[in-house]
Amino acid sequence: MAGKKKSKSDSVPLDLGNIKPLEKLQPVPKTRSSSITSIESADEPGTMKQVLLPPTIREFDELEQFEAFVRDETWDNEFDYFHGRLHYYPPFVMKACHDDVEKIKPTVNKNSKKFRRDLQHHIQKHLIKDLEKCCGYELNFGKGEVVETDSKVTWKFKDETDHGFSKEEEDMYDRHWRLELDVTCTNESAMVDVEYKSIPL
């Protein structure tokens, strides 16, 4: 179930050089309780347990909008409970075609070694570093895992660390979360899909 696209007018302009880091954790927002529902336990049929519904998926087609969404989730104290998707042409592709998508060569896709090398560089040196600035806390994705099929290649990253906060602080506010970042390209075009989730534990 996909959420609505966020319009440009909904957010403050993004300035990556001027984002304040998240210095300390706060209690879980009270509005989070509206996302809790009761379901029947699979382990003990007949009994109910409370679970947190998955967050609404927000979809974007511009990198700057996506990064602003991540920044806004931190500002709104929802940094541990969001799900965003980005469907875009990476900046190195747009630079090569002089911002004219009609000029993108059909060979610029996952089958091109140069495209894959450039995309991996973009992920490691730009996307993850920019997301870290937008989140306001440390991201520790490491090298990630590459999963490849005939039609697509996906870089999968997970961060299950303390994100630069002490265990005591995370325990005090019960703010433990995992981050998942998947970046996928296909053999059909230079379009790249990014899926970024922050999941409370």
UniProtKB/Swiss-Prot annotation:
Protein name: Respiratory growth induced protein 1
Keywords: Cell membrane, Membrane
Summary of the function given for this chain in its UniProt record: Involved in the control of energetic metabolism and significantly contribute to cell fitness, especially under respiratory growth conditions.
Lineage: Eukaryota, Fungi, Dikarya, Ascomycota, Saccharomycotina
GO cellular component: plasma membrane
Top-level taxon: Eukaryota
Record region (Disordered): 1-48
InterPro entries: RGI1 (IPR022554), RGI1_sf (IPR038235)
Principal localisation: membrane
One GO process term, biological-process aspect: energy reserve metabolic process
Biased composition (Polar residues): 31-40
Membrane topology: Peripheral membrane protein
Family: Belongs to the RGI1 family.
Subcellular location: Cell membrane
